[in-house]
Design a protein with these regions (language model features):
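Short, flexible helix-loop junctions that flank or precede catalytic/ligand sites
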Residues: 1-192
Length: 192
C-alpha cells in the first residue's frame, strides 16, 4: 500500500476506507481520476460502475479471474440478468480496448515463474463479435484479425518453450488445460 502524502496515487482499502469495491469506485469517480485500478471485478455493481467510468472517459484497469480473453468477456456479461446482457455487450464493445490473460509458468532454468500472456486488442471485428454475443468466435478473431500484438495463449506458451524459458513438460501441462489447443507442438524444439 502507498502512504498518503505527496504521492500521485490515491487508494481505497475495502474494509478500512470503503465498505465495498463498488462504493469505493463510485467515491473515486467524484475525485476526477485519470486512471482507475479495480483490484477485482466480482459483482454486478462493481462491473457496472467500472463500465460507466470507462464510458465517461476514464482509463480503467481491472482483473477478472478467467482462462482466456473471450472468457473474460463472457464473465462480465454473465454477471448481469438476461434482460440487461445485450446492453452490457454494447457498453463493453464500445469501451473495451484490450484484454490480457496470463498464466504464470515455472521457469526451466531455476526458481521463479515466467508469464505466458494471451493478448486481445479490440479491433472492429472483435468489437462486433462482443456486441453480437458471438464470443466463441473471438479465439479465431484473435488469431486472424489485423490487430497488432494479438496472440492466443497456446502460441504464447509455445513461444516460451521455443525460447527456452519453460520445459516441454511445462508446455504440455499448460496446453492441456486450454480449449482447442490443437496439436501439442510435438516437433518443436527449444532454442537454447
Amino acid at each position: 500500500l502507498y502512504p498518503a502524502g505527496l504521492c500521485t496515487i490515491n487508494q481505497r482499502e475495502v474494509g478500512r476506507d470503503t465498505r465495498s469495491f463498488s462504493s469505493g469506485l463510485r467515491a473515486a469517480l467524484r475525485e476526477d481520476p485519470d486512471v482507475i485500478l479495480v483490484g477485482e471485478m466480482r459483482d454486478l455493481d462493481t462491473i457496472q460502475t467500472a463500465l460507466t467510468a470507462a464510458e465517461t472517459g476514464h482509463l480503467v484497469f481491472a482483473t477478472v479471474h478467467t482462462q482466456s480473453a473471450a472468457d473474460a468477456v463472457d464473465r462480465i456479461v454473465d454477471v448481469f440478468p438476461g434482460e440487461r446482457q445485450q446492453q452490457i455487450r454494447l457498453q463493453l464493445s464500445m469501451t473495451l480496448r484490450a484484454v490480457l490473460s496470463q498464466q504464470l509458468l515455472p521457469r526451466r532454468d531455476g526458481p521463479g515463474r515466467v508469464p505466458a500472456c494471451e493478448v486481445m486488442r479490440v479491433d472492429g471485428a472483435i468489437r462486433n463479435l462482443i456486441r453480437e454475443g458471438k464470443t466463441p468466435q473471438i479465439r479465431n478473431a484473435i488469431q486472424t484479425t489485423g490487430a497488432v500484438g494479438n496472440i492466443l495463449m497456446e502460441r504464447a506458451v509455445q513461444n516460451l518453450f521455443q525460447g527456452g524459458a519453460i520445459s516441454r513438460e511445462t508446455m504440455e501441462r499448460a496446453l492441456q488445460g486450454l480449449p482447442d489447443a490443437g496439436p501439442l507442438a510435438g516437433g518443436m524444439k527449444p532454442r537454447l
